[in-house]
Amino acid sequence: MKSAFWFSFIDRINLKIFFILLFVYQILFTFQGLDLSDEGFVGTFYQQIFSNPESVQYNFMFWLSGIVGGVFNHFFGESGIWGLRVFSAVLTTASIILVYKLLKPYLNATHLKIGLIVVTLFLSNNTKVFHYNYLSVLFYILTISFLFKGLKENGWSYFFISGVFVAMDTLTRIPSIVNIGLVIAIFYHGYKNKTAFSHQFKQSLFFIVGFAGGILLMLMVMKLIGHFDIFINALKLVVQMGGSADEGHYGLLKLIQQFLGSYSASLKYAFIILLFLLLVAVGVDYYRTGPYYRKWILEIFKYLLILFVAFLAVVKVIDHKMLLYFLTGTSLMAGFLILMSDGIIELKTLMLMGCYILLAYPFGSSAGLITVGIYSLWIAFPIAADYFLNIRKADVSVNILESNAQFKAKLLAEGIQWNAVKRYTTILCIGACLYYAWYYPFFDYHERTDMRYSVNSKYLRGVYTTKERANVMNELISESSKYIKPGDYLLAYHSMPLFNYITRTVPYVRNSMPWFYNTSVFNAELNLAYERTKVLPVIIRQKRKTFGKSGSAWPDPEPFYDAIWYKKNAPRDSCMNIFLEKNNYSKVWENQMFEILTPPVSK
């Protein structure tokens, strides 16, 4: 199928320039947005993993990303948060190139580029610094690439290498252990090609041995550098927290409920929107072929529809989550249609692996699809985009037979109708991604034109936010310098690990973001911290929520009071208050967002 004229630029653009433009686009979004939580959480991990690894024990479920980040911090630590953001853009661009090379033989090149553009634009709204998800994406793409190469070329070593990458992915992000299930692609491909089961078994055995060997080797490295016991303690902690019915982020029942709820919503949104698009295509044909006045009606309807969708995005009826659901749902629906078709076995195998990642990758995350679903789209969505953009004809027939009568109806869409629908749907998807990237910087919901002020920290050079946010941070940095210095223990409570990072202080409770702890674990860590360090730390405490829909505009007033969130935090806050009272802490300074508390004397 020839590309429509509006595809011509993407179709003709030099491939190297295409990749460079995607890289530059990511870099453009690295200069704005100040996040206290996630970026500081991983940044502190990289600072402390070699010098004080026990202080970041909680992060050890992401051990390999900590090693990579720690090495980067050793050589480029002075580049701070901005440097880590550039590093993530480098890894993402590497992932884009690998996906392109993997899928190019089986997809229309223009459609593949469009799929990669949409995922890249959608990603720019999320956490920007290098962290475990960016590294995990690279590893699962390499896993699939080598596994697929092994299937095509019957190379035993490729299966082994693929298994090693699963091992590396697992120690980058523990939930990625589920990627061992990609072995299903070996049996699917073998079944479709009528390969002897004994041969399939040998292929899968090399894959499993590669995984086991990779895990064993990295555990040995952990042992050699003194990280093994800390890693085991981190795993025990995750299991312990998963058993908490009320507060645990990793409880099995909670993860299953999230899984079912998120993917059912994704399929629902995708089905409704795709059905609507079919009806639009039918309408286009009706008004295009009739009297001339119908064409005017069609033109008016087209622009009214675009304005209506834009309005829904502005008033947040269509939001970032709904867009994620749509991309996920369309990928799964395309996966089902491709697997049920008589298409190329290789493409079906790739889509099977892409859908497996799309379903399995978010499962072990504390918030499931909502937080990490975006990182699972890299294989499935470009294939889905190619599938839907290649559709030439679609029809839906209804035939109701009753004893005295028969009702028949048929919706048919083909040719020029689909071209218009595909064109505007793609434009709206890209437009929505750009809109949310522009108006909703990660946990810094402010007008970008107002985000031109920096914070007085060398680790935040090149990162700009609003004047108000910069001011409250500068006040805190200036005043806290009277009480802390690099290398001191500090408890930044409860969701502001960035402060540990920019002051190079050591997390007191073996986790720079105590909000991740449930109440019982936090209480135990407070008591254990004093026994371990014999130090009562300076405490920096935030006064209100600093992330999510209600908190991301700080220090501006919260748009609404998140009563459920504050109620859930109350038991942990109570433990904090008991600790402060027991040890006679006093408030020595505060502004509208933060307060500094100190013990009476150092013990």
PLM feature spans:
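Extracytoplasmic catalytic/substrate-binding loops of multi-pass membrane glycan-assembly enzymes
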Residues: L28-Y46, V56-F72, E78-W82, I225-H227, ...
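Transmembrane-helix motifs of polytopic, lipid-linked glycan transferases
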Residues: V86-Y106, L142, A281-Y286
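Transmembrane-helix signature of polytopic, membrane-embedded enzymes
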Residues: V99-L121, S157
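Membrane-interface alpha helices of multi-pass inner-membrane proteins
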Residues: L123-S124, F146, Y158-A185, V209, ...
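Short periplasmic/luminal acceptor-recognition loop of GT-C membrane glycosyltransferases, typified by
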Residues: A432-Y517, L536-S550, Q592-T598
